[in-house]
């Protein structure tokens, strides 16, 4: 399969994370961000339940996009009605790792410990994070005040990761030629006896 044909079948995914019990104002932001994800042609990844997750999925659906809900329980019926693909994990809050690992970038709205864990996991996994009118105290993430600007920034920040993924580099830096180029240097090393 050529690189060009892979590019046609590989879609970026953007996670939108935030409070499961959010204010109407925050849900309005999530809805607009969800629409922006669909308008970019990306797949929405979220926790699949209420609050920010439901508003983002509703926005994505209203713009004709696809949403995937990574659920904490074993029952797919727990998903909000706007989720197109519900994945029941039975993992509880540990499903947050799947949410961010499945995304190329994360847009984070206000939330509590669960949202903060998703931000931390995203940073650990090298996923770009954009705080949407939230998390300004975190200097390790980018920030935006507008939902469309947040998704646009997430889209652009995810681009280098997608290029590496499509090329088959599996997350290596663009200037890293891979393990085979280092093989001669490694061949001379002795293995430690452990």
Give the predicted meaning of each segment.
Residues 2-68:
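Glycine-rich beta-alpha loop segments
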Residues 58-102:
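Helix-adjacent hinge/juxtasegments
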């Amino acid at each position: 399969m050529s690189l060009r044909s892979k590019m046609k079948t590989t879609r970026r995914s953007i996670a939108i994370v935030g409070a499961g019990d959010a204010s109407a104002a925050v849900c309005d932001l999530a809805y607009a961000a969800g629409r922006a994800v669909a308008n970019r042609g990306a797949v929405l990844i979220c926790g699949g339940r209420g609050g920010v997750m439901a508003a983002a999925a509703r926005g994505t659906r209203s713009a004709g996009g696809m949403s995937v809900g990574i659920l904490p329980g074993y029952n797919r019926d727990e998903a909000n009605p706007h989720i197109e693909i519900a994945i029941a994990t039975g993992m509880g809050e540990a499903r947050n790792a799947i949410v961010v690992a499945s995304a190329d970038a994360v847009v984070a709205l206000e939330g509590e410990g669960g949202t903060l864990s998703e931000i931390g996991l995203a940073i650990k996994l090298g996923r770009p994070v954009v705080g949407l009118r939230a998390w300004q105290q975190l200097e390790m993430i980018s920030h935006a005040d507008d939902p469309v600007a947040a998704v646009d920034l997430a889209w652009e920040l995810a681009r280098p990761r997608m290029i590496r993924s499509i090329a088959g580099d599996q997350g290596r830096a663009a200037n890293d030629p891979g393990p085979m180029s280092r093989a001669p240097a490694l061949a001379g090393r002795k293995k430690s006896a452990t």
